[in-house]
Every structure is written in structure tokens, then in C-alpha cells.
């Protein structure tokens, strides 16, 4: 039966007795829940001083190393002994083959009352192993023999894996994370979870159901790897009516900042209703035009959220965020999430006052914000499929009917570069003379803006559709059929 000795994060033993006891209990419970999700039974779990001894019926080293609150986990052999000589022989007999023809070092930690020191143990074991090795090298050994002596038991370390540290999940409250699925928001979610906060995901569907399903897949991967001691929720809000409202009533350069403010407003209402302690975003200072310090101050001042807004990545640059994404195993998943078609791709204002922002928000139909905040959809990350998490729209299609009028709604430069055969650019379309008895298929890069336009055209009596997932997904599908 595999046995593991877990070194908890260094801050846990420093807490008060009451808090320390609560954190150990939560950590052991999280370990049990995570292993149970992998059909692994936790046979034994007990606190030994500042460490936790765990026994499982099958190998579980990697699973244990993915639990917040764990600093290091080591597979160990438990040795009982009566004196130093017996202990040294037990250790040597189990490690001879490991040190054979290699330079080695013996590292010993000891606690409790003994008639010997840690150095005595190291010397005795080293003397027994030296004839089988290339000698002792304390500075640059090929292999280390690591032993921890506690009372009348010794723990001989073998496989070791580093954990994430932090605090046990659920020990610090609940957070609602604004989640796009790109590089930033998953790393922000991971960082706040590392501090003991259970996170749920709030995703705004900006038009393309395909992009939103990709975001759900990132949330599931993050949950499987790091959050499996509870059941995270994926909450979606159809933001397309608000985007349409912004495009109709707000000048080009202000749209992105107004959109961010509306995201805060809806998130704050949902967080308050569902009892979250905080809202978390993946914002990094000045990474985007709408994320300058002036704009962030203006947005928060204009919205005045009841919830505290936490930004774990505020001081990170993009390269650091991407490196974290790689380290926590999400890079390949986040890199597949396409950016939604921008409502203001250029000339975004970098400095706005809260008064100006408030005046812009007042142009909008505030009833839409209330409606969107009340029409959220909640699914369990582990049990739902991407299609259940993000249902498709009736306006979306996967292929282009043969008699369709095809309209490219991207920039004119992109249209000239790689438009679909037979497509015309949006700027060339005379909607007064456009036939209403033929399918009109619109496309953009990811399917977001084209969906909004398709809805608008349907309201005017056209048989309008949006290419699901945009041009990239459509062309990828064509490649597969060739």
C-alpha cells in the first residue's frame, strides 16, 4: 500500500491552533474528495506534527501534488527501529541498488528524543553504502538518500513531487471569476484558488457559441487538474443584446470601456444574488487600452460595485501570464480559444473620467442590464457537456447553402486578403435591394459580430445566418473533408 508524507505549505503551521486545526481538516477532506473523484480510496490520513501521513490503495503521487495547501509530497517507506545500528542497516538495505556505482549524499532530519544526532545517522548509513558507490559527494551527488526520523519511526523518501502551496480550497470563501477562457482569466482563477478560495466561472457569450464552448473546455480542464475537491459551476450570460445596444448608441472609441463597465455591473448583480464574497478578473495593468489605470479607476468608480474586485494579475506582463499558463497545464487549451470579433478594434480611449463614463452608460437601456443579470444559466463543470453549457443559436449554421448571398463583415483589408469565394464585403451591400427569399450568410473571424448582424437582419425580414465559429472554424472543417 503506497504511503506518502505531505509537507504542508509553510504558512499553515504558523497559524493559531484553532485556525491550524481547521486548515488541516479542510486539507485532508480536499485530498479525500480529489482522490475519490479518481476512484482512489484514502485509507489513512493523520497529522504528524506539521506533516500529514497518507496511505492509498494505489499510486497517487501526482494527484496529491495537485492539491492547494500541499508544499511537497513524498512517497516514503516507514521503518521502525530500536537503535541507531538497526536503523542504519534498514536504510542501507533498501538503498544499496540506488547508490550502486554513483556518487551519493545522505540527508537526515530528526525530531524527538534519541541517543544520536542527525549527523550520526548520516555517518552510519554513509559508511554502509560507500563500498557499493563511487563515494560520498555532499555538494553535487548523483543521488540523495533522504531520511526523516520521528520518534521510533523513520521515513525513507523515494519519489518526490512539489505541490502548489497556498491554502486549502474552501478555507477562504467563494469567488466569481469573469472567465473568457484565454490566457489571463484561467491563470487569475488558479491564483485566487491557490489562496483557498473556491471559484466559479462567469462567462459572457459575445456571439459565437463555438468560442464559448472552447472557454467551457478550459474551465473543465482547470477544474479537473486543480479544483476537483468540489463541483465548480459555469455560469453563462448572453451578452449579445448589450453588445448590440453599445454598437447602436456608443461612439467607436468608447465602446470597449463601456463594455467593461457593463461586465462589472452584471457580474456584481449575480455575485450579490448568489452570495459570492468577491469578483475576480484577469485584468493586467495597461495590457489592453481599456485596462489602463485611468480606465480601471473610472470603470470601478462609475459602477460602484457592492462586491470587492480582485485582480491577481494586475502587475504581470503577458509573457509571465503565458508562462504560468504553461506551468499549470492550460496553455494548449487556452491557445485554442479564439478572440471574439472586436466591437472596437482600434482607437480605444485610454483615459476616461468616471463622469464621462456614467454619461455614456446612461444612454443605454438599463433594463437590459437587469434582464441579462437575471437570465444567467448555470451548469456543473464536471457533469455538463460543452453543448449543454452553451446551447447554439438558431441563427448559426455550419455550412453555406448553395444559393446563399455571402457577406464578409470583417475589415475591408481582411476581405481583400482572404475572403470566401463569391463573398461580398458588408460595405458593398445595398440592403434595400437585397433579396429576402434567399439565405444571407454572414461571417467574421470568430462568428460574434456576424451573429449580431444576422439577428438584426432577421428582424428586418431577411433569412439571415451567421457562420458558426467564424471563418477559421469553417476553413478548418473544409480541410478535414478534403
From Swiss-Prot:
Belongs to the ThiI family. NCBIfam families: tRNA uracil 4-sulfurtransferase ThiI. InterPro entries: Rhodanese-like_dom, Rhodanese-like_dom_sf, Rossmann-like_a/b/a_fold, ThiI_AANH, ThiI_fer, ThiI_N, THUMP_dom, THUMP_ThiI. This is tRNA sulfurtransferase. CDD domains: PPase_ThiI (cd01712), RHOD (cd00158), THUMP_ThiI (cd11716). The active site is at residue 444. Keywords: ATP-binding, Cytoplasm, Disulfide bond, Nucleotide-binding, Redox-active center, RNA-binding, Thiamine biosynthesis, Transferase, tRNA-binding. Residues 58-160 form the THUMP domain. It is found in: Cytoplasm. The gene is thiI. It catalyses: [ThiI sulfur-carrier protein]-S-sulfanyl-L-cysteine + a uridine in tRNA + 2 reduced [2Fe-2S]-[ferredoxin] + ATP + H(+) = [ThiI sulfur-carrier protein]-L-cysteine + a 4-thiouridine in tRNA + 2 oxidized [2Fe-2S]-[ferredoxin] + AMP + diphosphate; [ThiS sulfur-carrier protein]-C-terminal Gly-Gly-AMP + S-sulfanyl-L-cysteinyl-[cysteine desulfurase] + AH2 = [ThiS sulfur-carrier protein]-C-terminal-Gly-aminoethanethioate + L-cysteinyl-[cysteine desulfurase] + A + AMP + 2 H(+).
